[in-house]
Amino acid sequence: MHHQSSRAEALVLQTLYESGSLALEHMTERIPELSWSEVFHAIDRLSRKGDIVLRRRGFSYHLSLPTLSHV
């Protein structure tokens, strides 16, 4: 279980490094090898640790790396 969660977190971070800010629904599209639940839980863990920033914009949520969160 820990290995899978670490892999999911690594894939989320890699996707953000490549894409910059990204809507939550697009993150799930960019990592088709993970279930929606795996992506969501990885985002939750990374956000709680401060490794990513999760912000609500209108009716959706956007993800970014902390250094890009001011954009």
Q: Which residue ranges define each predicted feature?
A:
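Short, cationic-aromatic polyanion-contact patches
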Residues: 3-5, 54-71
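Proline- and acidic/polar-enriched loop/turn elements at helix boundaries
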Residues: 28, 41, 58-59
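Short amphipathic alpha-helical interface segments
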Residues: 5-30
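Glycine-centered, phosphate/nucleic-acid-interacting loop/turn motifs that mediate DNA/RNA or nucleotide
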Residues: 50
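Short amphipathic alpha-helical interaction segments
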Residues: 34-45
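A generic secondary-structure micro-motif detector
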Residues: 2, 32-33
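Phospho-regulated, low-complexity intrinsically disordered regions of nuclear gene-regulatory
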Residues: 12-15, 37-39, 64-71
